[in-house]
Amino acid sequence: FSICFGDLLFFCTATIQGEENCMELQIYHSVNEGLYLWNGTSGLLIDGLHRGREIGFSDTSEQYICMMRQGRSFFAKPNDLLFTHIHEDHYDQALVDEFQQRYPGRIVYAPGLDKDNIQPVVLEHGIARMQIEEYEVYAFTTVHDGKIYEDEPHCSYLIRWKNRWIWVSGDAILVPELADRIRTYTGQDNVWKAFVMVYQISSESGKAFLKKLVPEQICLYHLPYPEDDRCHFCNLAEQKCRQCKAEGLPVKMIESDSFIDS
């Protein structure tokens, strides 16, 4: 009999807050841009099955793969998969295939993926809506950062659960006009958490986007485990977080393999 270390962490958290009556959305960050949203009855895994070590990021941990294969912890209840794009540090075809074999019928969606099993409803040019369990998901067609990637399919996501709005940037170029489009959907509500990566908070347009969006919390992700960080992304992230704080943007660098504070 084997058990994953993460099972204990998840069990304790769910027990303390009440798994059946969880009134608060919990978010767990694995590594790279992996996010797991849990509302007490169903989960949404975003960019969570991937590789990346060969390009200076990290592979999905063995702990996480163990949970998927044994149907434990995060994978003990219904889960669906969402991807911002299919670069290797976000998406691994072999792991996705294994997920679909073990959990047939669960939703898998990524822009440009020919195996999608959900059809988004187009609301306007560049914005489509999906209902995934209790999660209302708005897919914004965005442009991947970097000239060589600009023609590759990429989506950023605005996700609503009850009165909580979450913005998941992926690797998009962020511009102030995008914040205006997001606000047309959130209305008077604030974005609860906005997830951004280091290149976005390094650019003037990315910082202008955040100043216009005014999320309650700015979370910096897309960082590898320290042992995989051969490109020194973590040092750069710490430096950029300090610069943003000096400019009035309190960016929080979130830890890998941990729940994000409410």
Annotate each predicted stretch with a short phrase.
Residues 42-82, 94-97, 173-188:
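Pre-active-site segment of Zn-dependent metallo-hydrolases
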Residues 23-70, 150-171:
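Conserved beta-strand hairpin/beta-sheet module of binuclear metal-dependent hydrolase folds
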Residues 53, 86-93, 115-117, 128-130, ...:
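Active-site environment of divalent metal-dependent phosphoester hydrolases
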Residues 68-130:
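Active-site HxH/HxHxD metal-binding segment of metal-dependent hydrolases
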Residues 144-213:
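Active-site-proximal loop/helix segments of hydrolase catalytic cores
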Residues 46-47, 78-89, 109-111, 167-172, ...:
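Active-site neighborhood of phospho(di)ester-bond hydrolases with catalytic His/Asp-centered motifs
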Residues 1-22:
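Short, Lys/Arg-enriched N-terminal segments with co-localized hydrophobic residues
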Residues 28, 119-132, 151, 210-262:
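Binuclear metal-ion centers of metallo-dependent hydrolases, dominated by the metallo-beta-lactamase
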